[in-house]
């Protein structure tokens, strides 16, 4: 059974539009979790393809300063994975949600319960950056009969054989990491990045999205030329925190309506 996230993003790709997925940190709002659906609605109204929802954690190894600080602000409001899932169960969203979490909160929650409770939300994808592919069976047996896709991350340093291993049988989309390091770094792209992304996109039979360091309209244009779309995190998180909702809406609208 093809999962909803795969079909949804593939339909956008087939329509010759760029896929645009913004990242937000759950609980990083003046109203805490009570503001979560306000942010989701703002992004939905701007035409996003899906929304990545970050789970705050005390040791976010893949996060740069902006997202790490957002997580700290959320944790200071006593936001937990349990509270986030309960909030997401309150109503369905217009677009699929993708949870980005580290493995520890999932382990503490209970893997089977985690997947079961997520099934009662609009979450259709799951990203766990500190879960190596070799240990994916930690959670895949529970996801197999669900409509939640485990999204693989492919970095610049991933060898060809391992790339194929990660891509073959993957669901949802391929998360192509544009920089070596944490989120939020901008501009320090390798010379062979475009070729790397083009090769990934040509090989994969599901959409390939470029993330980490994507922050400008020029980035959106560049990466839509060599992949199927982009994920934007740090810029969105920073601008929302700074109260720049109109600027966020304009940027997201540009990315979400980008014609190939």
Curated annotation (Swiss-Prot):
Q: Can you provide one Gene Ontology molecular function annotated for this UniProt record? A: tryptophan synthase activity
Instruction: Name the domain of life this protein comes from.
Output: Bacteria
* EC number, as in UniProt: 4.2.1.20
- A Pfam family recorded for this sequence: Trp_syntA
Please give the catalytic activity noted in the UniProt record. Answer: (1S,2R)-1-C-(indol-3-yl)glycerol 3-phosphate + L-serine = D-glyceraldehyde 3-phosphate + L-tryptophan + H2O
Is the Amino-acid biosynthesis keyword given for this protein?
Answer: yes
Residue positions of the active site = 52 (proton acceptor), 63 (proton acceptor)
A GO term from the CC aspect: cytosol
- Kindly tell me the pathway this chain contributes to: Amino-acid biosynthesis; L-tryptophan biosynthesis; L-tryptophan from chorismate: step 5/5
Provide the assembly information.
Answer: Tetramer of two alpha and two beta chains.
Q: What does this protein do?
A: The alpha subunit is responsible for the aldol cleavage of indoleglycerol phosphate to indole and glyceraldehyde 3-phosphate.
The record's comment on protein family reads:
Belongs to the TrpA family.
Name assigned to this protein = Tryptophan synthase alpha chain
């Amino acid at each position: 059974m093809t999962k909803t996230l795969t079909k949804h993003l593939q339909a956008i790709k087939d329509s010759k539009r760029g896929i645009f997925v913004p990242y937000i940190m759950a609980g990083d709002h003046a109203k805490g979790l009570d503001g979560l659906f306000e942010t989701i609605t703002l992004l939905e109204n701007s035409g996003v393809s899906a929304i990545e929802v970050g789970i705050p954690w005390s040791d976010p190894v893949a996060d740069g300063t902006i997202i790490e600080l957002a997580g700290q602000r959320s944790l200071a409001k006593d936001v937990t994975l349990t509270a986030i899932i309960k909030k997401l169960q309150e109503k369905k969203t217009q677009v699929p949600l993708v949870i980005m979490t580290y493995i520890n909160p999932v382990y503490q929650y209970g893997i089977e319960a985690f997947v079961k409770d997520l099934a009662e939300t609009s979450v259709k994808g799951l990203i766990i950056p500190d879960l190596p592919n070799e240990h994916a069976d930690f959670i895949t047996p529970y996801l197999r009969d669900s409509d939640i896709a485990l999204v693989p991350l492919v970095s610049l340093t991933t060898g060809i054989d391992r790339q194929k291993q990660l891509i073959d049988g993957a669901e949802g989309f391929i998360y192509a990491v544009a920089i070596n390091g944490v989120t939020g770094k901008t501009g320090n792209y390798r010379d062979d990045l475009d070729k790397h992304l083009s090769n990934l996109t040509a090989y994969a039979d599901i959409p390939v999205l470029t993330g980490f360091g994507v922050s400008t309209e020029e980035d959106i244009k560049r990466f839509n030329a060599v992949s199927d779309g982009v994920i934007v995190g740090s810029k969105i998180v920073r601008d929302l925190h700074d109260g720049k909702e109109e600027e966020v809406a304009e940027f997201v609208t540009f990315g979400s309506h980008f014609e190939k």
